[in-house]
Amino acid sequence: MDNFLALTLSGTTPRVRQGKSAGFRWRWLGHGLLELTPDAPVDRALILSAGIHGNETAPVEMLDKLLSALYSGSLTLTWRVLVVLGNPQALAAGIRYCHSDMNRMFGGRWQSFAESDETRRARELELSLETFFSSGQARVRWHLDLHTAIRGSHHLRFGVLPQRDRPWEADFLAWLGAAGLEALVFHQAPGGTFTHFSSEHFGALSCTLELGKALPFGQNDLTQFSVTSQALSALLSGVETSTSSSPPLRYRVVSQITRHSDKFALYMDAQTLNFTAFAKGTLLAEEGDKRVTVTHDVEYVLFPNPAVACGLRAGLMLERLP
């Protein structure tokens, strides 16, 4: 199964759906779904996902290179792994999504969207995670969902962590720093993301990794993310990564800007970078007689997007943590 990406993009079902490779067994579970199980018993399970948005290709290329290293035997596997290429049709078309944003649908939220390929895929991925985690006895469960951002950013690589009732484990946060993430953003409320679903329903330590800017296949400079790729290789092979000399900055979400109607106006232009700072009192958005302003001394914007569908998030506002 050294052609997993090509099969996924072409929508082709492989003639052989399972087999053995260098120290592990593999099973093709469906389009964009591949399970890897080491020959030796392990108590760690990892979801490695990318391509939830079809125009975010750099992480997909990174995963393809990692799989090639595993199949060639140059990389040893020490985790049970489920590799997920989230939205095969959008990946093949080179578009963010075909109908609706899948990363708003998880945790059963797909039921509130008009039925589409994305709603069916979100349901399929939920069931795939259920099967994967229930079929093993993993003591450690991680989910790394690899993305790229629509906009540029003051932090080239950053992580977004779902709301979690329990404290985050130090070794997980340390690994994120070792993977080159310059900032970590902590959600304070539930959401429909893939990582919130895996964290809430399966207790996984989950993070959305944002790695640079969305570009078409073949146009990515993967050297920008070599530190992340090296950290993933070390993780898969069970090699401890060195702690980052400069730990990631930490932010928490303090508010969400939501577009409710066509009267919505977001006062940020196309050049506004993620993590741009705004001073207290700054007018951020208006919708009819409703005004959204900065309420803390300084707030930072994340994922500003005035063109979202009504009812969806047009941006997050953050505050820096000590």
Curated annotation (Swiss-Prot):
Reactions catalysed, as given in the entry: N-succinyl-L-glutamate + H2O = L-glutamate + succinate
GO aspect biological process, one term: arginine catabolic process to succinate
Residues that hold Zn(2+) according to the record: H53, E56, H147
Residues annotated as the enzyme's active site: E210
GO MF, one example: hydrolase activity, acting on ester bonds
Enzyme class: hydrolase
E.C. numbers: 3.5.1.96
Protein role: Transforms N(2)-succinylglutamate into succinate and glutamate.
Family: Belongs to the AspA/AstE family. Succinylglutamate desuccinylase subfamily.
Protein name, UniProt field: Succinylglutamate desuccinylase
Protein source organism: Salmonella newport (strain SL254)
Classification lineage: Bacteria, Pseudomonadati, Pseudomonadota, Gammaproteobacteria, Enterobacterales
